[in-house]
Amino acid sequence: MYGGEDFNNTQQDFYDDYAHTGDPALDLEYERNYYANRMPENVKYFLINFCQAIKEGNLYDIQNMYENTFPQISDHHFDKSAWPEEQEVGAIVDNDKVFLILYKELYYRHIHARIPGGPKLDQRINSFFNYCDFFNLIISAQNPVLLELPDIWLWELVDEFVYQFQNFAQYRARLTDKSQDEIQQLCVNHSNVWSILCILNVLHSLVDISNIKKQLEAISQGIDPQTVAGDFGKLAFYKMLGYFSLVGLLRVHSLLGDYYQAIKVLEPIEIHKKSAYSHIPACQISTSYYVGFAYMMMRRYADAIRTFSDILLYIQRTKQLYSTRSYQNDQINKQAEQMYHLLAICLVLHPQCIDESIQQVLREKNYHDAMFKMQCGDLEVFKSFFVFACPRFVSPCPPVADAPLEDYVKDPMEHQLLVFMDEVRQQKDLPTTRSYLKLYTTLPLTKLASFIDPNANEDDVSKLLIRLLCFKHKMRNLVWSKGPSGLEGTFKSGSELDFYIDDDMIHIADTKVSHRYGDFFVRKIMKFNDLNRKLKNINI
């Protein structure tokens, strides 16, 4: 097979294409030519120009190539395959260290997003070490690294870092499809790869080195943030990485089920107000999703409803900003759909008025049918809505090497679902109680007990008192009013009615705020006038 003439000819052909001379300069030139000839011309041209733009810090060109050219080439040449490997790219960009780290970040991100079957174990590990190289480069430096990248790339870099941690945690928890050798690699040889401590350490280090918390506090007090930014935080590169790392920490703690800490890490950010840092739509939407979900799990339904309503209105009004980027559009649409599901849950558990345009979407998408079933105590609808809309939870502790060969991916999800459904069961009967109370201004306890159960006795009246106390308790929530901390607030009753019991008589007061129909009609009139102007300008 490999004998004589055939082998010699093959060997000669190989050395004709890629010869080593012993001279490092000549060998580098041979290597450059060898890989350049294998690469499509437009890919080679793009990589050379991309490297040059990053070297020169030309933000406009970097952003254009990152947001437009890279996805276009990916669609055309690498739709279901990987981009060229580091060795091939290094040969045509003079092995530029910084560029190769950034290129590999895009390379592994592309593999996670596009390659059927997802990345292999060695690719997941190499991606982790590439992130380590990048963060060590910018955090361990004695002086600030003079690197400029567009804010959208910095956000997506941090977001992808957290996503790959989440993806690896789920991959590691699925032992049923792995050999003993793979389990040994994961649990023993590479036990620190994508560990929760590494992720938290990186994100907190970026927050600390940028002094972003001090800068945000200075802004809230009307002080120039540059006075507290420090040498690193003065640069937009470090400042934005620090801000996005706060959002990354919010996401990580939410994935772990630590909702108090998730909100606490955002304390310098006034999450219910717009800021100069919230100009990346995907970042703002992701922040609101995790904040709203954390509020819901903490039983702060009024804050969750406000958070979801505000961001869903924002999505309605700014859709054109991200609709040109299909992958981002898909991600935002999915997150918006999840938030509508969570909003529907919150409105069932804590009824209140919301913006008419959000109500209209809920009607158009038939959420009201599901909401009616939830109000009637259908626990399966609650469960299906929660499973669709919640984050993909992970466990901070991976399975040990000698654990039974089972699928542990669903364990964190099932635990959070159990906690949520326990709360729902406690509130299951409250809509029925509310519906009777809304019909009266005074109502004897015995009469209400007979409405709920026609065969009610004295014991049932005692149980009714417990139910009414539960109603009072569940409808009284901690609600944020002001201040930089999303954990602060005052206790308020969120129900449309309030009541007290005097002897055996329930006294009921309707506290419902009437709809402001004027605003709705003004918006519709303005929309109609705008449409009328456009029609008049059309030449037929």
From Swiss-Prot:
One GO cellular component term, please give it.
eukaryotic 48S preinitiation complex
Tell me the first and last residues of the signal peptide: none
List, alphabetically, the InterPro entries matched: eIF3l, PCI_dom, TPR-like_helical_dom_sf
Has keyword Cytoplasm?
Answer: yes
* Protein keywords: Cytoplasm, Initiation factor, Protein biosynthesis
Q: Which Pfam families match?
A: Paf67 (PF10255)
Report the subcellular localization.
Cytoplasm
Q: Where is the PCI domain?
A: 307-515
- GO biological processes: formation of cytoplasmic translation initiation complex
The protein's predominant localisation is cytoplasm
- Name the source's superkingdom: Eukaryota
Gene Ontology terms for molecular function: translation initiation factor activity
Q: How does it assemble?
A: Component of the eukaryotic translation initiation factor 3 (eIF-3) complex. The eIF-3 complex interacts with pix.
Describe its function. Component of the eukaryotic translation initiation factor 3 (eIF-3) complex, which is involved in protein synthesis of a specialized repertoire of mRNAs and, together with other initiation factors, stimulates binding of mRNA and methionyl-tRNAi to the 40S ribosome. The eIF-3 complex specifically targets and initiates translation of a subset of mRNAs involved in cell proliferation.
Q: What family is this protein classified in?
A: Belongs to the eIF-3 subunit L family.
State what protein this is by name.
Eukaryotic translation initiation factor 3 subunit L
Q: What organism is recorded for this protein? A: Drosophila grimshawi
